[in-house]
Regions:
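P-loop NTPase motor core
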Residues: 88, 94-173
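Acidic active-site catalytic centers that drive phospho-/nucleotidyl reactions
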Residues: 10, 53, 109
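A conditional alpha-helix N-cap/helix-loop micro-motif detector
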Residues: 2-6, 31-34, 88, 129-132
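Conserved residues at the C-terminal ends of beta-strands
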Residues: 83, 109, 181
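Conserved P-loop
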Residues: 18-97
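Short, glycine/charged-enriched secondary-structure capping and boundary segments
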Residues: 39-40, 64-67, 96, 120-123, ...
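Pre-Walker A adenine-sensing motif
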Residues: 4-17
Length: 215
């Protein structure tokens, strides 16, 4: 298990980020999705990590701040293999790298962006969902067969029915656990889905050192 760095969230996840599981972190912009993904990387930093960045949001200086907060050396940043992915073909091709390397952690930030960009027309909606589901199926198989913990981040989109995770129906088939990040007033909240029974969530704040739980 890899810790998220948030004790309460780890408990809701059953111990943390598990091997052979695809964990989906989703929420609106500025909510801390990338920060949480980086924090998970820092907690797995002794392993080889593949970090695929589809939006140009990866900032090595943020990882360094988190390492320094844990009194860890900057040389550990070398354990993170960063891929700047610019189109769907590159994103799909990067599956081969995962298969060959079998890293201790894979992070894909953000998993749906390029599919939404390249298939932006309404007439391409079906093709977009099919292509994305094929990709997620391959990623999920790699994750399960090689017992690799995989973390993906995703955005939300608004329509007349409210806000929903981007490509929600297509991604939900292939993700085993979801972490929904949201904000109520001045409070950031993290909830693990599926949630059976009473709603369970933790509150957190965003700091230079990462996400901190508010107890």
């Amino acid at each position: 298990m890899i810790s998220t760095g948030l004790v309460g969230l780890d408990k809701l996840l059953g111990g943390g980020i598990a091997a052979g599981i695809v964990t989906d972190i989703f929420g609106p912009s500025g909510i801390g999705k990338t920060q949480l993904a980086m924090q998970i990387c820092v907690n797995a930093i002794n392993e080889k990590i593949i970090y695929q960045d589809t939006s140009g949001s990866f900032r090595p200086e943020r990882i360094l701040e988190m390492l320094q907060a844990k009194k860890l050396g900057p040389e550990l940043l070398d354990n993170i293999i960063i891929s700047r992915v610019r189109n769907i073909s590159e994103q799909i091709d990067n599956l081969k790298k995962i298969s060959e390397m079998r890293p201790g952690l894979v992070v894909i930030d953000t998993v749906t962006d390029l599919f939404s960009f390249e298939y932006s027309k309404e007439s391409n909606a079906l093709e977009k969902h099919i292509k994305f589901m094929q990709y997620m199926h391959s990623l999920c198989l790699l994750c399960i067969q090689n017992k690799i913990p995989v973390v993906v981040t995703n955005v939300v989109r608004g329509d007349e029915e409210g806000y929903h995770e981007n490509l929600e129906k297509s991604i939900s088939i292939f993700t085993h656990k979801k972490i929904r990040l949201s904000k109520e007033g001045n409070k950031f909240l993290a909830q693990v889905l599926p949630c059976f029974g009473a709603k369970k969530e933790i509150a957190y704040k965003i700091t230079p050192q990462g996400l901190d739980e508010i107890t």
